[in-house]
Amino acid sequence: MILAEKLFKCFKQKETFTLQDAYENNSDKPKETIRARIYDNLGIRFIRLAKGIYRTIDSYEEACILLEGDGRELSMFEDNSIDCILTDHPWLDMKSNKGGTRAFAVYDCFKYSFEDFKEKARVLKEGCFLVEILPAENENNYEYLYQIKQYAKEAGFIYYSKVTWKKGSFVSNTGRKAKNTQDVMIFSKGKARSMRYDKKKSNVTGEECYMSGCNGMLPTMFNVQPVSKKDRIHQSELPVSLCEQILQFVTYEGEIVLDSFAGSGVVGDAALRIKRNCILIEILKENIEKIKRRLGNNILFQPVME
């Protein structure tokens, strides 16, 4: 039996396996040979989910893994290894995150730097999409929101579109005006890949043709009610239906989505529901336990670093 086939049979019933697992199960073979057989069969027998973490292609249709760590540190990922980044970073805005005697953000917050976008561009595949969930513009954050776009541009991203997330009937009466929106900011790494069906060209050629852009015309807005206080497990938890809608525009089934600031784990939940693979990164122990409880009964979920 050839080594690649042996590795496949050994791990096909497991959700994920590591290089160390492969070494231990084939101790009679040099580590360099084992790595080479896995690399030679990427896309054939194996798929790489993260650096040193793999699964067999037909073990399950999708997988979700949870990494404990800093979401700004992406060095564990190979270049051009991710099909989509969808994230809602805990943005620092000391004024907007307070109202009266209330503090709305109780977790660690920060502001993006150019290095953050440089790393996002490194791990994302050419033409694929970066989706950032951002606050609505106000007098306190407009400069930062502009800076984010500049960082993205300098890192090689192209501004694709912005779609408003209207939070259903919810209205927040804080600040200078009532608020009920956030922004879904979409960038592509270089020219957007061809996901958009070209009806005119398809009719002329008699074949399915696609042009540069998302998988369909983006809506005027995403009108989705936010998660209720009694149901949410994280202060800034996104609705799973919002994440599903976004992912259907920017990914295909079987692709790998990265959420580097997982929070409640909702992006992983949404990805699995619509047959996408997902990698979640979360730094807070409290949130990691919540994600485990949320997805722990899902046979496609595997926390790999604790």
What residue spans do the PLM features occupy?
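Core catalytic lobe of class I
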Residues: I2-I288
